[in-house]
A protein has these predicted regions:
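N-terminal membrane-anchoring alpha-helices
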Residues: 1-51
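Short, mixed charged/polar active-site loops
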Residues: 38, 54-56, 160
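Hydrophobic residues on conserved beta-strands that form the core of alpha/beta folds
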Residues: 38-40, 60, 163
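Conserved catalytic scaffold of divalent metal-dependent phosphoesterases
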Residues: 47-48, 65, 127-215, 221, ...
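Short, flexible hinge/linker loops that cap or flank conserved catalytic cores
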Residues: 50-52, 81, 112, 155, ...
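Short, charged, solvent-exposed linker or helix-capping segments at domain edges/interfaces
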Residues: 53-57, 174-177
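Membrane-embedded segments
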Residues: 55-150
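His/Asp/Glu-enriched short active-site or ligand-binding loop at hydrolase and phosphoryl-transfer sites
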Residues: 223-229
Length: 286
């Protein structure tokens, strides 16, 4: 039987298909790293004062100098559309690899503070760049409350809760410890409801969960960078595999943590199946 030559697909068509696939992958990768995702969650507690039932808290973490829209306008509009009562900045506004200037944080902080009362704690990247005191002073002048190992009271509906914040452990060797701050909180506040803003997610279980806060709010973990089903992400910021405590709510020692997946990337890192997150927490009295 005579053999017939196999028909070959034109080489040009194969190249075109590969180019289209490459463009689709590039588009998806860009979308994964630059398309904002509003994540709405509810934190319920019977200890929450009635006046704070329905309070809206926007959490922004780990921007690392990222820009969403011209002058961050897309991010600012997204935050404003949530009508927040409070905005919490959970550290790493700046990035040591890009050497993000203070002006980035100050401009963003000023515009966020025009939307709602805004509170900030440092992350490890702030301390890897020069002159943290100057950054804190500039943010304060811009209308942002810097919680450097201290606490403030928040008021709503005739009730009060307490918000405390700690500097990143990469700060000064003699800075107040979280445990010392917690002692001050309990001395001033007794058994009242309080929140703790602290950058590092990986310190919740061993340390922050033992301080007595009702809710600890953190970032740092970048959602595990690559989100896979049934995992907390693939890679930690310390470059270990399958990290824990990277996104959402966790409970330890009668305390709850909310961990933001964050917004930006540090240096050569990236996101996959893990879009930049604007977290919107609704406090609920249950």
């Amino acid at each position: 039987m005579a053999k017939h030559p196999r028909k070959r697909r034109p080489r040009g068509r194969r190249i075109l298909i590969l180019l289209l696939l490459a463009l689709l992958c590039a588009g998806f990768f860009r979308w994964s790293n630059h398309s904002l995702q509003v994540e709405r969650l509810t934190f319920s507690s019977s200890r929450l004062p009635e006046g704070f039932d329905g309070c809206t808290v926007v959490v922004l973490a780990d921007l690392h100098g990222a820009v969403f829209g011209e002058d961050n306008q897309r991010l600012l509009e997204t935050v404003s559309n949530q009508a927040p009562d409070v905005i919490l900045l959970a550290g790493d506004l700046l990035d040591r690899f890009r050497e993000t200037p203070h002006s980035y944080a100050v401009d963003l902080g000023r515009r966020l503070a025009a939307i709602a009362p805004t509170y900030f704690v440092t992350g490890n990247h702030e301390w890897a760049l020069p002159d943290v005191p100057a950054l804190k002073e500039a943010l304060t002048e811009a209308g942002v409350t810097v919680l450097d190992n201290r606490f403030v009271t928040l008021e709503r509906g005739g009730d009060q809760i307490l918000l405390a914040g700690v500097d990143d452990p990469n700060g000064y060797a003699d800075q107040k410890t979280p445990e010392e701050l917690a002692e001050e909180v309990h001395a001033a506040w007794g058994d009242g409801f309080w929140l703790l803003l602290a950058h590092r997610n990986n310190l919740f279980a061993p340390r922050y969960s033992r301080l007595g806060a009702d809710l600890v709010i953190s970032g740092h973990g970048h959602g595990g960078m690559i989100r896979l089903p049934f995992t907390d992400g693939l890679i930690s910021v310390e470059r270990t595999l399958f990290p824990s405590y990277t996104a959402g709510f966790y409970e330890e020692n009668s305390s709850t943590a909310f961990i933001s997946r964050g917004l930006g990337n540090s240096g050569p890192s990236f996101r996959l199946f893990n879009r930049p997150e604007v977290a919107v927490l609704t406090l609920s009295r249950s």
